[in-house]
Amino acid sequence: MKQGIHPNYVEVTATCSCGNVIKTRSTVGKDLNLDVCGNCHPFYTGKQRVVDTGGRVERFNKRFSIPSTK
């Protein structure tokens, strides 16, 4: 392996907006601020909501007189 061409791989701290702190290693070289993590992401916490866009699709089809595919 060539010497002096690889970036420094240092320990960094990733802090989430929920307050969770994750220690990891990275070539970024500075601490990271995260918006979401595994502790607060809706998919992992079970608070995920399904957005129903059926009404919008029907309104679009009605507006542009596209026959329904059902």
Swiss-Prot record:
This entry's comment on the bound cofactor is: Binds 1 zinc ion per subunit.
Q: Which GO terms describe its cellular component?
A: ribonucleoprotein complex; ribosome
Keywords carried by this UniProt record:
Metal-binding, Ribonucleoprotein, Ribosomal protein, RNA-binding, rRNA-binding, Zinc
Q: Which Pfam families match?
A: Ribosomal_L31
Tell me which cofactor or cofactors this protein depends on: Zn(2+)
* SUPFAM superfamilies according to UniProt: L28p-like
A single BP term in Gene Ontology: translation
In which domain of life is the source organism classified? Answer: Bacteria
Which residues take part in binding Zn(2+)?
C16, C18, C37, C40
Instruction: List the PANTHER family hit by this protein, alphabetically.
Output: 50S RIBOSOMAL PROTEIN L31, CHLOROPLASTIC (PTHR33280), LARGE RIBOSOMAL SUBUNIT PROTEIN BL31A (PTHR33280:SF6)
Function statement: Binds the 23S rRNA.
Subunit structure, per the record? Answer: Part of the 50S ribosomal subunit.
Q: What is this protein called?
A: Large ribosomal subunit protein bL31
| Native organism | Pasteurella multocida (strain Pm70)
